[in-house]
A protein has these predicted regions:
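Bacterial N-terminal signal peptides that target proteins for export
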Residues: 1-9, 327
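Bacterial Sec-dependent N-terminal signal peptides
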Residues: 2, 13-38, 67, 106-122
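Surface-exposed binding patches on compact interaction domains or structured appendages
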Residues: 29-32, 48, 53-81
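A short beta-strand micro-motif common to beta-rich folds, especially ectodomain repeats
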Residues: 80, 91-106
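Short, surface-exposed loop/turn segments at beta-strand-coil junctions that are enriched for proline
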Residues: 85-91
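N-terminal extension/subdomain marker
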Residues: 121-221
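Catalytic-core segments of thiol-dependent peptidases
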Residues: 166-170, 178-188, 199-294, 305-306, ...
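Terminal, contiguous helix-loop blocks that mediate binding/assembly
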Residues: 251-511
């Protein structure tokens, strides 16, 4: 009996061994986190991919001007780092070679994957800087950065560069960072390029240093600038402070409260980008001087700030930028939808066409999708300025020249209350420029000439508006009855002593 039992155990062992020997060998598996990796243009730049395998693997390299490590691995995930050994001095991306990954060794090789290795030009085709000074909008700034990160992919910004400068730690410091695509994770990463131990947003020298660093860290053939902050148009910082200390609450018709302070919102108003960070503002003329002194030129400026589509402001900035995108009224604190905006800024179209799409995306978001973010309203007005048309740098009579002749001609009076305004103050400061000229000009020929030149300076296709605009100064939506996309303070009954010092007034007033 015992011998029989032993024989049965032996038979079971033999059968089990036979069954195991018939099990299939696992199918070799080898995956890469990317099929292509693009190294930065400088020597020493690095990129990484993640290798996932169910067994041992090794690689072979064809090409030159890059190193790779490690050259083999085992089961699991392995991060492989590639390093450029030469600078790409060409104007376009170049192919350095390929890396072939194989599981197993020799004749036992199984799965195979190929990685293409490229290198961007050392001088990028395009660098975009998002500058967000101040801290009162910090949570919204962080949301804006997250929006950019969602937009970044293997194709966006491509060979371009995206830099961000803001003040996450305090009013006296700043951080210059880059948002780029990470081939190892398939997502975006944020890399700190420089920390500023001493940085004051109101100091021209701080801005000059930061702008110089942008060209140092991310040299490019073209530069674009987005400024996201509180905006006060042409109003000098001292004028705003003086008025804020001296004005009080007024009333709307019907007795509702309305602020008349520069720049004090009503209690419980929804947040916009028109106030905050008092004491850290920079006058627009000082900002323009910094820009004009740079050894390179920004092709465009996008203001993610309130009131900056203002003729007095745009005229101050005309020499520093070819195009300026801005809003004549308040911008909700959420700002631009960067996840939708950034891809257009790095498309293959010309600058004007790209910015026209940016205007549309901004308007479409606030017209149709404004409820997708909290503390928001259906309030989005935008326009695009072609600065060469303001002063005639395009070879035609400038808008300034036409306006000066129009202001010198006979004008009719009208009820100021019928003029489109762009804030909810009890005593208005910003009025619609096109509406003002239409109501006051009696010379039909001059008016036609103005409108023709105005349309060249502010193309109609990019003058977009929602039916109303929200103002934190009266805490409500205000209807838009006439929209030209740009404001003026010419008819305003406040701050005249400062207004007369603006370059626009001096160029157009004939008193």
């Amino acid at each position: 009996m015992l011998r029989t039992f032993r024989h049965m155990l032996l038979l079971c062992a033999v059968l089990l061994t036979a069954a195991c020997s018939k099990e299939k060998t696992p199918t070799p598996r080898l995956e890469l986190s990317a099929a292509e990796v693009v190294l930065r243009g400088g020597s020493g730049s690095e990129a990484a991919v993640t290798v996932t395998a169910n067994g041992a693997w090794e690689l072979t390299v064809t090409g030159s001007d890059f190193d790779i490590t490690p050259v083999s691995g085992s089961r699991g995930e392995t991060v492989v780092t590639l390093t450029a050994t030469q600078e790409n001095t060409q104007r376009t991306r170049r192919t350095l070679g390929t890396v072939t990954f194989r599981t197993g060794t020799g004749k036992s090789s199984g799965a195979e994957r190929t990685l293409e290795v490229c290198q961007s030009p050392a001088t990028a085709p395009r660098t975009m800087l998002l500058y967000m000074p101040g801290r009162s909008l910090l949570s919204f700034y962080n949301n804006n950065i997250d929006g950019i990160r969602r937009a970044v992919s293997a194709q966006v910004p491509g060979d371009g560069r995206i830099l961000v400068c803001y003040q996450p730690e305090g009013q006296q410091t700043a951080s210059l960072q880059e948002i780029r695509y990470d081939f190892a994770t398939g997502g975006s990463v944020v890399e700190t390029l420089k920390e500023y131990a001493s940085f004051t947003a109101s100091a021209p020298q701080s801005l000059a240093e930061m702008f110089a660093d942008v060209a140092e860290y991310a040299p490019a053939e073209e530069y674009g600038l987005i400024v996201g902050c509180h905006g006060k148009a042409w109003v000098p910082t001292i004028a705003g402070s003086l008025y804020a200390s001296g004005m009080q609450l007024g009333t709307q018709p019907g007795g509702a409260a309305v602020s008349d302070n520069l720049w004090q919102p009503l209690p419980d108003a929804k947040p916009t980008r028109s106030f905050g960070d008092t004491g850290y503002e920079i006058d627009i003329a000082d900002f323009a001087a910094v820009i004009e002194a740079l050894p390179y030129r920004f092709d465009y400026l996008i203001f993610d700030a309130c009131f900056m589509a203002n003729i007095e402001t745009l005229y101050d900035l005309r020499a520093g930028f070819d195009y300026i995108v801005a809003s004549p009224c308040e911008i909700m604190a959420a700002g631009f939808p960067y996840d939708r905006t950034v891809p257009h800024l790095f498309s293959g179209e010309g600058t004007y066409d790209r910015l026209a799409k940016v205007c549309y995306v901004f308007w479409d978001f606030y017209q149709n999708d404004w409820q997708s973010v909290p503390y928001n309203e259906q309030s989005g007005c935008i326009s695009l300025c072609v600065t060469a048309a303001l002063d005639g740098r395009d070879g035609q009579p400038g808008l300034d020249d036409v306006t000066r002749r129009l202001y010198a001609a006979a004008r009719q009076t009208f009820d100021l209350n019928t003029l489109q305004s762009y804030e909810g103050l009890a005593t208005h400061l910003f009025y619609d420029l096109g509406h003002y000229v239409s109501l006051s000009c009696v010379d039909a020929a001059l008016l036609d000439e103005f409108r023709m030149r105005f349309d060249e300076a502010f193309p109609a296709e990019s003058r977009l508006n929602t039916p109303s605009f929200y103002s934190a100064y009266n805490g409500r939506l205000n209807p838009i009855i006439s929209y030209s996309g740009v404001s003026t303070s010419k008819p305003a009954q406040r701050l005249q002593e400062y207004y007369e010092q603006t370059a626009w007034d001096q160029a157009t007033n004939t008193r």
